[in-house]
Curated annotation (Swiss-Prot):
Pfam families: GreA_GreB, GreA_GreB_N. This is Transcription elongation factor GreA. Belongs to the GreA/GreB family. The lineage of its organism: Bacteria, Pseudomonadati, Pseudomonadota, Gammaproteobacteria, Candidatus Pseudothioglobaceae. GO terms for molecular function: DNA binding; RNA polymerase binding. PANTHER family: TRANSCRIPTION ELONGATION FACTOR GREA. It comes from the Bacteria.
Amino acid sequence: MNNIPVTAFGAKALEAALLKLKDVSRPRIIEDIRIARAHGDLKENAEYHAAKEEQSFVEGRIKEIELKLSRMQIIDVTKLSQDGRCVFGTTITLMNSVDNSEITYQIVGEDEADISLDKISCHSPIASALMGNEEGDKVIVKAPKGDIVYKILSVEYYI
């Protein structure tokens, strides 16, 4: 199995999600099932079936997160060679060559990606175009509406 790259922040978020599922959701669902069973006939007990369905989902999510945690490779961007190259974990400021607008993204793992927080997946078209390039380079991003040319203004190595 391949390692899954993740930032230290992303690893902590996954660990927190797992802890919440195990320590909050799982016990609550067990209690919901116990209460629903007390209502009698389980064949037509909607509360029981809903709780069992939620239990199945939560247990599946726990297994999924545990697998990811066992396979993840935490990358501390502050310990990387700070040579101005775009790599996993770096925060990159770009300038659109058409309208000179600036945008800043951090390249993160799949589970951490959130465009509303300017965090893009390392597998996204933008990140793929940026990886390995350095400050001052121009990159072409293959987008659904056509190619976009960006100039890399800065590459920062912080968490």
